[in-house]
Every structure is written in C-alpha cells, then in structure tokens.
C-alpha cells in the first residue's frame, strides 16, 4: 500500500496488481486524445493479450487509478520484434540494454489528478517485480512532447526512424536506479546493529531469546577468514543482513541429498567413486539397448505388456520414468570450463560422472517407487568442499526483491568456492533469494526436516543469450544432451532444423540455444502447433488466452527443452525469448501416458522438460458424444471430433512469462488412490497460480489408469463414473505427484510421519486419508453342514475378521490390479474351459463380474452366484424392472443363483489353500459346491491394517474414522474423506456419511478447504454462526453407478445424494413427482427419468443392450424439464416413445456442452439484474408475486412471460444465447443463428 497526494491535497491509498480482463472498460475510459497520439490507436484487449507485463493501480475502493502495459519489443514498428537489440545499442552504446534487462512501455493511462504519483508507483512496482530489469524504453513520435507526467520519469536518448513509413520517433529511457535501485553491499560493522535489530524482531524473536539481546553484534564481531557478515544499505542505513560460513557439513549433505549434478559440491578428485561397477555395466547395456534403435525401446514396451504382476509393472514403469527424468535433468552440467568475465574468477570443472540428478520438476515427472529391497549406490567424493553456506539472512520487506544483490559480494569473499548453499525448514515460505537457487532432491531415506538450496557462481552471469541455433552449435548441443535418454531425437530435430528449417511434412521447425560465455547451456526445439482446433475444443486453453487474438502461426508446440540447472532461474527468460524470437504467443507441451512415453525414440517421444514447473497444466474439457450419423453434414469437423492419443497439456504464453507462482513446500501426503484422493490431487495440481512441490500419494498399486485391461474388455467392477483411463491420461498426475507404492501400517503423530509395510517412513505436514473401504476376505462360520444346520442356527460371523492365509484362488476385487491378477489366473489355469466359479456377495459388482466371466468364455453352467442374506431391504439396483431383466438373463445364460446363503466352510474345514469346495447354509438346507475360483464381494469394510494404523495412532474411530464438517480428525494435521469416514456423533446425523455423496465432489471440497491454508488470493474463511456449527454439509453432485450387467445390458443409474430407501417407498410419497419410462428392461430399451416436484431431473436409470453416451446423460441431472424441450408435456402427449432417440436429437446437444452451465448462470444474472431504473427485475417480480405484494389479473406465469417479452430482458437473453452459440460453434455447428439461415 502507498499513499498518493494530488496537487489539491487530496489523498488516495493505492496498491498495484496485475491487470485483469475486466479492467478493459475502465482502461478505455482513461484514454485521451493525447494518449492516442503518444501510443497510437490501440486494441486494448489485443495489447493486454500480447503483453509480458500489465500493471493496474487501484485505490482502496478498487477503483482503477492508472494502468501501464509493457512488452519485450518496441512499439511503433521502429525495429523488428526479433532484432531490436542492435538498433538500440547503436542509438547509445553506453546503455547496455539486452532482452533480459529491458522492457518497452506500450501504454500508460491514469487519472489526471494523480497521474505523476501513479506513474512513479507503477514503475517502482515493475522494477520490484522484475529484478533483472534495468531499462524501460518509451517510444513516441518525435514531434510529440511526453506531457507533464511521463517527462518526470523518462529522459530522451535519441531518435530512431520507423521501418514502414518515413517518420522519426523519439526514444526515451527510464533507469532502475531512479525508482528501485540495486543495493550497496559491504562488510557488516557493529554499528549496523541498531539498524538491523528492528528488522530481525519483525520476523522472529527466537534468536534474541536464545542468544541474548546483542547476538547480532557478537556475530559481526566474530568475523574471520571462515565467517563473514555482510549488509546491504540504502542511503547509509542497513536494510539487510547475511552471515556466511565456509564450513559445511558435507557428509550430512551427501547422506541426505542427491548432489550428483554438482559433483557433490566438491572439487573433482582422482579417487572419486562416481558409480558402482554393476551400475556401470547395466548402464552401458541399457544405453546400447535404448539408443541403438527404436526396436530396443519397443522391446521394453512389449515386456511391459506381458502378463506380469502389477507390482512388477509399477516398479518397471517407475524406474524407466525415473531414469529418463534423472538423465534429462542432468542436462550437461559438464559445463565446467565456462570462461567468465574478468570480474568473476574462472570456474573449476564440474564433473558429473555418471551420477543421476532429480531436479524438482524432474522428480515430479517420475513416480517415486519404493522397491521391496531398496539398494542405493551413493557416489563417494574425496575432493575438497567447493561450497559455503548462508547461516543467517534477513532483509527489510521493502527491499527483498533485491536479495540477489548480496550474492556477487559474498562470492567475492570466497574466491575458492563455486557453490553457495542454504538449508531451510521446508515450511518456510519461498522468498525472493531462494527463487534463484536450485532445490535439491532428498534421498528416499532422508529424515532431515530441511530443504537444501544450491546456487552456482555462474548463475550470477547476466550475459545469457538466447538465439536461433546454427550448424556450428551442434558439438555444443551434443555435449549438453549426451546424458539424455532422448538425445538422439533432439539431435535429429536440430539437424533437420539446420538443413531445412522444417519437417518433411512441411511443419515449421525452430531450434533455439541458450549461450553463456560462448558455451551452449540450453536447447529448445519447437514446431508450429498444427492441432490447435483440437486443443481449443478439448482443453480449457481459454482459461489463459483470448483465442481469437492469436493467429494460427503464433501457436507453438514445444518438443524439447533442456537447460543446465546452474541457470535454472533463467528458464522463464528462455521461454520468453522463444516466444519473442519465434514470433509465437503461446507454447504447448504434451505429456503422453507412460505406455506411450516408453517408446523413447519415436515421433511421440518428447524430451522430459525441466521447464514443466514454469508451465501451467491445462484442464481437459468434457466432450459431447455426438450422434454423428444423425447429424450428417451438421456434425463438428473431424479436427474437433477426432479421438487421437490422449495426452496431458501444459501451456505458457506471453502474459505468463513474468507471472510468479505461489510455491508451497508443505509435505502433503495422500494415502489411498481412491476417487476422493485422485479428485483432491487433481484440484491442487490444476491450481495454475500455485506450485505444490511436495505432493505424495501412498497407494498399494501406485496411480490408477495403467490400462491393464483392454478398453474392449468387460470390467469386473462397476464404475462410479468419477474417473476413467482417459481421464488419468489427460491429467498426468505422475508429472506433479510423487508416488510411493506401499501400504500404510502406522502413523507417528508426534514425529509426523507415516510408516509403510516395508518399514519405510514418509514424513508429512498434512496427512490426507482417503483409503476408502474394501471388500474383505469372508470369514466362514465353520458350521458343519453334515449336521444340516440353517442360518438361524449358525453364529453370526459378519463382524469376525479372517486371519488365516488367503487361498491362492480366492479373489477380492477392489481395483484394476486385482482384476488383472484374476484375469491372468483365469487364463493361466484354463478356468474358461473347466471348473466351477463361485461369485459370493450381493453388490452390483457381483453382476458385473458374472458378465465379465461370461464374456471371457466361461460357461454359465459353471458360474454360481451365491448371495448372502441382505443387510437391509434395499437391493444394490433398487429397481424391480432392472433386477427382473438381469435375473432372466442369468437364467438364460445358465448361471445358478443361491439366495440367503452364508459361507460355512472351505474344503469341508480342511486346509483352505487352494479352495476345492465351498459349503453354505441357508434358511432351509445347506449345500456344497465344487470350486476352482472364488470371488468374494461381501460387505465392504475398512482394511484391517488401515484400522490398526488409525487405532494405534489414537485417532477417534467409531466403526469408521470420525471427522468434523471440515474433514478434520482429532489431529489438526490429519484430514480424512470418503467412505473411510463418518461424521462425529455431535452432529446427530449418523445416516449421512461421505458414502452418500459423489466421491469426486468430496475430493474437490476437501482440496478447496485446504487451499485456504496456502492461497493468499482466497478470501479468509469466516467462522459459521454457532447455530450452524452442528449442521453437516450437503453436497449436490449426482451419485452414479454403472457397468455391464448379465445379458450384456449396459446399465447406468444417476441419482441425487440420499439416504438409501426402497424405490417403492419413494414412489409412495405424495410429493414424489413424475416417472417417465420408455422401453422395456427385458428388451434392453429401458430408460427411466424421475422428475421431482420442482420439475427437476432427480433420477435417471438406463438399461440397454446397445452402448449409450453415459457422459451425455449425466449432464441431464439437475436440469429443469422445460429445458429438455418441455419433456413432461411431450411425454404426456405420447410424443416421446424412445428417450434414447429423443436425447440424440440435435436440439439437445447444447445441454451436454461443458460451458452450458456458464450460459445458465449468465441468463440468470440477466433476469436478476435491474436493466431499467424504475422497473423491478424479473426475479424481483417473481418474489413480489410470491409474497402477494402484487396481484396480477392473469396467471402469474403468463404475467411474467408477458413482462419478459415486452421488456429489454428478452433481447438481452436472445443476444446472450446467440453469442454463446456463435462462440462455441466449433462444438455446436448444428445450431442455426442469424446470418446463416
């Protein structure tokens, strides 16, 4: 906050922020004729879209006082966008302007009364936001004066001609030192104590309490050759302090952190041991296999596709991805021998050997797999330490953006050191200084509660130059990428660029190199993005850009990016220069699923990019399933409707190049890859303005979505339609989340770590428990059926836990890996041709499993569906028509059903492994079945190991883990969600649990609750009133289940969250509403819609022998029946005989569009707004009629309709609807609008 005073003495409290799209109207209102003469006639939206930095100044009422826009190339066309440096160097050789330290002002507007103060405040903010910036140029016609405002901050340096017409333009310059100067750094003196202590006390009092009031003076006095204290000063006053020491505990750092890329922070020594002989031989064989030809990588893929165990597959895939990420981040740190300017001492060689390095972003790219027997080779460095450390650092908040000014001086104090390190508690918010450091990745076994940051002396160089690659750069690039798995692909693209500048198919190709001191330290290869229509229609790219303001050729597809980690802090600058030099405005980077990335040397293989954390992940868009045959020529183009290989999309553009992200280093551990856990992670990952460095998932089988089962195969388990394999590919959570494969067996709340089954520990700051409930191995009652016992005579074993060895042919299917194991067992043991299969349970998964077995070729006569007594009167399908059709299909297939049967014994009470027979009791007489394979789908429960871990940790557990309405357990650091949990008894709502709601919505709400801890842009959470504190939240998302049932019936059931109640009881209620049914369940044409008393769609049930677009039907939930083309009236008039056909008609496709909800909100906002001064809004009129404040002579509906049609509201609604259709015409070309009819 700053205070501006006008010449008249008026005062305004102002602050700066990034310009937003809604500012455009106010910016236009501040433009004067003089503004147009200075800057030209501008399209403000277009200018903001292409700007690198746009700053708005607001007062405390959020009224816009001023705005300025800056780009990285000059306006008025006085120089080419990609070649302005030489022009401005010739103008004044004393101004060392470079693309790194220069911006150009393309617009400035302000409220006249405060314009001078606004201008200075904006410039100070810009220089603070961009520490590398030293010069801002302003170019205006030479005949124009700058006016009374700009002339106070800009000085003319010369004239320059225009390239397109004969006119000269005056060049003015604004220097950093006039607004936010570099800090003077010197050795500390004792007299600095009084200046510095208030700054220290502002942040922390622990040092004073621990070491006494004069600890700082004592530290300054204790300086020697190994310890130095330095300060930065402004006008003779110390405003910052840094204490550095040459003594570093290298042994501890080598034990805890992977320091491979920097040679262990040591000088090279002949006796260094950089790799074990075994690893060396393995690496050589891998290199020969992977780099010789694409056949080698194909071989790996084929091996992965063989029927191996899921555990083995996860480990293989994780290791391949991890090695690729390690080698990518290595990027040629053999950039030793960098010849430096005279003011920096020549660097020693940096030897990487064969050490592997996981950069922050690279670590996120690879799954962190804990193998069963982890064996880690640690390099041994025998050379002297090449690092010094920062022991204490503090700086006044006003000057923290200049923190890096310390580094030149402290490196001069240690002329024999190449590295500066600092260790910080990992919860320390990321401050300006460490944003320039490289965060090192700890080893899996590291328990140090500190993060290590490293900065290399060469990182101080400002002479980095980004340019197009040339043929002479090839040796330097080869040296840079020699350790990359994809080096062959990069070098091939570079060679293609040098020879033809394009691909054989004509796609434009561009290659850029980053050069420091005549050495190549970075390489990037981009192509023109040819699938931009597909990207626009399948990804929410318009969250970041106004698509219409970007030309087709301005979209670039980044294929390769590698940068020496020493210069990691120049990554954004590298990306910015790629956009400027390549005449691009947007860059896209694709991450393909692992199965595709495994083919390292093929067209789909992109090099893993260390720039990933500087890009933003783009959410995929929900797609309409089009009836293409019915639409004919009105169908969307093939560029929109095609379904190529799914990939996750990452993006950057000119606006984002100077946009900082909020970094969160808190260790957030999610236990369980359930739909709730995945939804939670998805929400955090797609917060584009935030970067979570320590997201970890602990899961028995790692991330889901491995596509172990072919798409064409029947699924053993029913689906909740939260996520599918394509969704996982589109998210690419493995790019952002560390995955630990293991089971949680304990929680140490005091030490804040999770204990795994392998005795590994995973520390946490926030623990999220989403393990859900799983099918358990049933515990036989051990009743002797020879005694002819009935169910009433046997003990209830439902609460008992099976503790024996699980038989090898017994299967409880909880996730895809379990289904894959079952499938392999069926194939390897000839189950499809011989032996009985028992499916035990009464959930919907029993039906989908039976259908899968039938589809695999198992004869129905050998399948026995045994259903235990139901726990309630509500069946899993809760619809007699569907149940009857499924029962008939089971009978027709020859499947035998047994009802109310309780498992008594396996193998007549003998050793149960493997199971040869199973005995059951019933209400009448017992029976015994031969068994080759046993599937158990008894009631789900919390896994015993999970329960024991929770119970031992003293978390409150009452049949489930107890939480409050904010997901908290009795430990503030531990949250939980999903079917694992129940609400505390103080809410008096035991019937309602998270199981009643959509898992995806629960995960989203959990993430939203946690984001308030990390995101300063969110409004603070207000405490609910005392009387509302005892109410549980009610979520509105639909609860969905679906699958393929016996008879090859495709089944889908969508309903609002509710306490389960028999359908017949629901329909007997007087306010039930309407039931619309077409078709017959037994014929496979059944479609049922329940419309509630408010005329809203509340339930949808589909049963069809033909596949149907389930994702379309899910969008119908919660819609008003009139929105469905007066559904009820048409049904009553017998105009609808087939709802399947009805919802494939072209008129309804807009309902399935992902942005239709936005249109509804916009239209509602129009009706709620007062468009005419003296008249109430339509919404107010409706309330007045309801409250009987007005009594129209006609029916209320007719009255409102007449008012609507006679007022401006009708025109506004029609215009908004037509705008929606026009803007989304690539998805909705089947609709007509004025001009095409």
Swiss-Prot record:
GO terms for biological process: cilium movement; cilium organization; sperm flagellum assembly. Pfam families: CFAP61_dimer, CFAP61_N. GO terms for cellular component: axoneme; motile cilium; sperm flagellum. Residues 281-290 have a biased composition (Basic and acidic residues). Its main location: cytoplasm. Keywords: Cell projection, Cilium, Cytoplasm, Cytoskeleton, Disease variant, Flagellum. It is found in: Cytoplasm, Cytoskeleton, Flagellum axoneme. Residues 278-301 are annotated as: Disordered. InterPro entries: CFAP61, CFAP61_dimer, CFAP61_N, FAD/NAD-bd_sf. It is linked to Spermatogenic failure 84: An autosomal recessive male infertility disorder characterized by multiple morphologic abnormalities of the sperm flagella, resulting in severely reduced motility. Some patients also have a reduced sperm count. Component of axonemal radial spokes, the protein complexes that link the outer microtubule doublets with the central pair of microtubules. Interacts with CFAP91/MAATS1, ODAD2/ARMC4, RSPH3A, ROPN1, ROPN1L and RSPH9. Interacts with DYNLT1, DYNC1I2 and TUBB3. Interacts with WDR35, IFT22 and IFT81. PANTHER family: CILIA- AND FLAGELLA-ASSOCIATED PROTEIN 61. Involved in sperm flagellum assembly. Plays an essential role in the formation of the radial spokes in flagellum axoneme. This is Cilia- and flagella-associated protein 61. It comes from Homo sapiens. The gene is CFAP61.
């Amino acid at each position: 906050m700053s205070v501006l005073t006008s010449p008249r003495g008026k005062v305004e409290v102002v602050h700066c922020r990034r310009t937003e799209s809604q500012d455009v109207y106010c910016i236009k209102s501040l433009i004067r004729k003089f503004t147009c003469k200075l800057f030209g006639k501008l399209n403000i939206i277009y200018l903001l879209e292409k700007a690198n930095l746009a700053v708005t100044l607001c007062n405390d009422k959020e009224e816009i006082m001023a705005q300025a826009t800056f780009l990285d190339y000059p306006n008025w066309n006085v120089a080419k966008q990609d070649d302005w440096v030489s022009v401005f160097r010739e103008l004044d050789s004393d101004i060392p302007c470079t693309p790194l330290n220069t911006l150009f002002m393309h617009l400035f507007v302000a409220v006249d009364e405060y314009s001078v103060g606004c201008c200075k405040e904006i410039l100070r903010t810009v220089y603070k936001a961009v520490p590398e910036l030293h010069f801002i140029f302003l170019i205006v016609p030479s005949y124009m004066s700058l006016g009374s405002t700009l002339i106070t901050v800009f000085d003319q340096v010369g004239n320059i001609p225009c390239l397109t017409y004969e006119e000269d333009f005056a060049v003015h310059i604004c220097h950093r030192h006039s607004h936010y100067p570099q800090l003077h750094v010197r050795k500390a003196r004792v007299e600095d104590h009084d200046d510095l202590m208030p700054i220290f006390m502002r942040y922390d009092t622990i040092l004073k309490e621990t070491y006494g009031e004069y600890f700082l003076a004592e530290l300054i006095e204790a300086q020697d050759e190994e310890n130095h204290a330095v300060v930065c000063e402004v006008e003779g006053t110390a405003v910052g302090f840094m204490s550095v020491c040459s003594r570093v505990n290298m042994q501890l750092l080598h034990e805890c952190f992977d320091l491979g890329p920097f040679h262990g922070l040591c000088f090279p020594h002949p006796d260094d041991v950089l790799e074990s002989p075994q690893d060396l031989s393995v690496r050589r064989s891998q290199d020969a296999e992977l780099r010789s030809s694409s056949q080698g990588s194909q071989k790996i893929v084929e091996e992965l596709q063989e029927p191996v165990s899921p555990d083995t597959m996860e480990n293989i895939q994780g290791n391949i991805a991890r090695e690729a990420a390690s080698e990518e981040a290595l990027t040629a740190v053999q950039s030793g021998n960098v010849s430096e300017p005279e003011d920096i001492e020549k660097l020693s060689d940096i030897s990487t050997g064969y050490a592997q390095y996981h950069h922050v972003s690279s670590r996120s790219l690879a799954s962190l797999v804990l193998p069963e027997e982890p064996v880690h080779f640690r390099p041994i460095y025998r050379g002297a330490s090449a690092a010094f450390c920062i022991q204490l650092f503090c700086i006044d908040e006003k000057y923290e953006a200049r923190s890096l000014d310390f580094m030149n001086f402290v490196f001069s104090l240690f002329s024999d050191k190449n590295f500066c390190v600092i260790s910080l508690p990992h919860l320390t918010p990321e401050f300006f200084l460490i944003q320039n450091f490289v965060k090192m990745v700890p080893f899996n076994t590291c328990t140090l509660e500190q993060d290590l940051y490293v900065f290399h002396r060469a990182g101080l160089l400002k002479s980095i130059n980004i340019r197009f690659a040339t043929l002479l750069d090839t040796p330097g690039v080869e040296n840079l990428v020699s350790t990359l798995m994809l080096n062959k692909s990069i070098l091939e693209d570079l060679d293609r660029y040098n020879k033809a500048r394009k691909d054989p198919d004509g796609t434009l190709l561009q290659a850029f190199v980053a050069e420091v001191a005549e050495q190549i330290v970075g390489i990037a290869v981009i192509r023109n993005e040819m699938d931009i229509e597909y990207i626009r229609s399948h990804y929410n790219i318009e969250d970041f850009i106004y698509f219409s303001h970007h030309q087709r050729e301005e979209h670039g597809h980044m294929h390769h990016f590698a940068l020496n980690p020493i210069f990691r802090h120049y990554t954004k600058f590298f990306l910015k220069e790629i956009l400027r030099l390549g005449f691009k405005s947007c860059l896209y980077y694709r991450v393909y699923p692992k199965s595709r990335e495994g083919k390292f040397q093929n067209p789909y293989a992109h090099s893993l990019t260390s720039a990933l954390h500087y890009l933003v992940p783009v959410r995929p868009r929900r797609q309409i399933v089009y009836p293409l045959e019915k639409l004919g020529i009105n169908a969307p183009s093939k560029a929109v409707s095609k379904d190529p290989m799914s990939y996750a999309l990452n993006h950057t553009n000119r606006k984002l190049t100077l946009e900082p992200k909020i970094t969160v280093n808190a260790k957030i551990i999610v236990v369980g890859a359930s739909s709730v856990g995945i939804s939670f992670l998805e929400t955090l990952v797609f917060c584009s303005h935030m970067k979570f460095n320590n997201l970890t998932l602990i899961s028995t089988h790692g991330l889901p979505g491995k596509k172990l089962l072919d798409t064409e195969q029947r699924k053993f388990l029913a689906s909740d339609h939260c996520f599918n394999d394509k969704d996982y590919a589109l998210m690419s959570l493995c790019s952002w989340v560390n995955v630990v494969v293991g089971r949680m067996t304990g929680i140490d709340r005091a030490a804040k770590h999770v204990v795994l089954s392998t005795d590994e520990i995973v520390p946490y700051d926030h623990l999220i428990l989403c393990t859900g409930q799983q099918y358990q191995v049933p515990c036989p009652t051990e009743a002797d059926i020879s005694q002819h016992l009935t169910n009433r005579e046997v003990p209830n074993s439902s609460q008992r836990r099976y503790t024996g060895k699980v038989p090898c042919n017994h299967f409880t299917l909880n996730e895809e890996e379990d289904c894959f194991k079952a499938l392999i067992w069926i194939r390897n043991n000839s189950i499809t041709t011989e032996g009985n299969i028992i499916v035990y349970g009464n959930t919907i998964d029993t039906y989908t499993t039976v259908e899968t077995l039938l589809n695999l070729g198992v004869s129905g006569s050998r399948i026995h569906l045994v259903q235990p007594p139901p726990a309630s009167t509500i069946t899993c399908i809760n619809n007699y028509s569907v149940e009857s059709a499924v029962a008939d299909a089971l009978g027709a297939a020859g499947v035998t059903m047994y009802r109310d049967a309780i498992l008594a014994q396996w193998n007549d009470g003998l050793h149960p492994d493997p199971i040869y027979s199973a005995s059951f009791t019933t209400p009448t007489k017992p029976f015994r079945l031969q068994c080759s394979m046993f599937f158990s789908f008894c009631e789900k429960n919390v896994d015993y190991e999970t329960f024991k871990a929770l119970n031992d940790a003293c978390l409150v557990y009452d049949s489930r883990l107890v939480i409050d309405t904010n997901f908290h357990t009795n430990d503030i650091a531990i949250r939980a969600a999903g079917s694992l949990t129940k609400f505390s008894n103080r809410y008096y709502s035991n019937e309602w649990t998270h199981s009643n709601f959509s898992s995806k919505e629960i995960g989203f709400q959990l993430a939203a609750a946690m984001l308030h801890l990390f995101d300063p842009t969110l409004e603070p959470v207000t405490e609910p009133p005392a009387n509302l504190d005892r109410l549980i939240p009610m979520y509105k998302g639909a609860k969905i289940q679906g699958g393929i049932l016996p008879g090859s019936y495709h089944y889908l059931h969508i309903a609002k969250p509710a306490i389960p109640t028999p359908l017949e009881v629901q329909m007997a209620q007087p306010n039930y509403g309407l039931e619309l049914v077409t078709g017959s369940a037994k014929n496979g044409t059944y479609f049922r819609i329940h419309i509630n008393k408010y005329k809203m769609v509340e339930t949808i049930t589909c049963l069809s022998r033909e596949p149907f677009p389930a994702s379309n039907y899910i969008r119908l939930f919660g819609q008003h029946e009139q929105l469905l083309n007066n559904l009820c009236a048409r049904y009553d008039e017998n105009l609808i005989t087939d709802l399947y056909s009805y919802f494939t008609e072209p008129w309804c496709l807009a309902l399935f569009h992902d942005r239709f909800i936005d249109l509804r909100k916009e239209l509602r906002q129009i009706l709620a707004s007062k468009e005419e001064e003296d008249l109430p809004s339509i919404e107010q009129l409706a309330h007045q009629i309801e409250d009987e404040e007005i009594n129209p002579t006609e029916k209320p509906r007719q009255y409102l309709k007449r008012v609507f049609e006679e007022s401006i509201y009708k025109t506004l609604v029609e215009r908004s609807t037509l705008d929606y259709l026009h803007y989304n015409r690539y998805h909705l070309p089947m609709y007509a609008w004025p001009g095409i009819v």
